[in-house]
């Protein structure tokens, strides 16, 4: 089986349907004896340029190892699902399991925010003791 990186963008009005779509697509892959190495839901993001007069979309990234039949079925599902506005399937040489730069940046921002909040709590606690 080959390794693939799959990114698809969902219409922003259909964002609440994304978990069901992810479940359906992962079931397609695992049903064909494929494995999912990485699954990231990036959420709603600004598009670089308008697509069908839309300026935002809900992004999902999958890194999978699957047979060609499963990938063909996924591409067909993307094509006939009106909620999916764009999709891209790329073959990669090996499985990618580490977090993408998008998720790493989000985690770093969250850690900085938590550190700042803790530092603020320490300062407030120190002021009240005096």
UniProtKB/Swiss-Prot annotation:
Keywords from UniProt, A to Z, are: Ribonucleoprotein, Ribosomal protein, RNA-binding, rRNA-binding
Q: Which InterPro entries match?
A: Ribosomal_bS6, Ribosomal_bS6_CS, Ribosomal_bS6_sf, Ribosomal_S6_plastid/chlpt, Transl_elong_EF1B/ribsomal_bS6
- Asked if the keyword Cell cycle belongs to this entry, the reply reads no
Q: Which Pfam families does the protein's record reference? A: Ribosomal_S6
Gene3D superfamilies, alphabetized = 3.30.70.60
Q: Which domain of life is it from?
A: Bacteria
Task: Tell me which Gene Ontology terms the entry assigns under biological process.
Answer: translation
Query: Which residues lie in Acidic residues bias regions?
Result: 117-130
Q: Where is this region: Disordered?
A: 100-130
Q: Which residues form a coiled coil?
A: none
Q: Which GO terms describe its cellular component?
A: cytosolic small ribosomal subunit
Which molecular-function annotations from GO does this UniProt entry contain? small ribosomal subunit rRNA binding; structural constituent of ribosome
Question: Does the keyword Transmembrane feature in the UniProt annotation?
Answer: no
Comp. bias intervals (Basic and acidic residues): 104-116
Q: What does this protein do?
A: Binds together with bS18 to 16S ribosomal RNA.
**Entry-linked HAMAP family:** Ribosomal_bS6
Q: Which family does it belong to?
A: Belongs to the bacterial ribosomal protein bS6 family.
Annotated NCBIfam families: S6
Q: What is this protein called?
A: Small ribosomal subunit protein bS6
Q: Which gene encodes it?
A: rpsF
């Amino acid at each position: 089986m080959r390794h693939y990186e799959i990114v698809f963008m969902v219409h922003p009005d259909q964002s609440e349907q994304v978990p069901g779509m992810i479940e359906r697509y992962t079931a397609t892959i695992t049903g064909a004896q494929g494995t999912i190495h990485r699954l990231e839901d990036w959420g709603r993001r600004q598009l670089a340029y308008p697509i069908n007069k839309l300026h935002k979309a809900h992004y999902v990234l999958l890194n999978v190892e699957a047979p060609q039949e499963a990938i063909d079925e996924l591409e067909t599902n993307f094509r006939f699902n009106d909620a999916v506005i764009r999709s891209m399937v790329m073959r990669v040489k090996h499985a990618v399991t580490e977090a993408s730069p998008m998720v790493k940046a989000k985690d770093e921002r969250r850690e900085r925010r938590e550190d700042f909040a803790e530092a603020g709590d320490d300062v407030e606690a120190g002021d009240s003791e005096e």
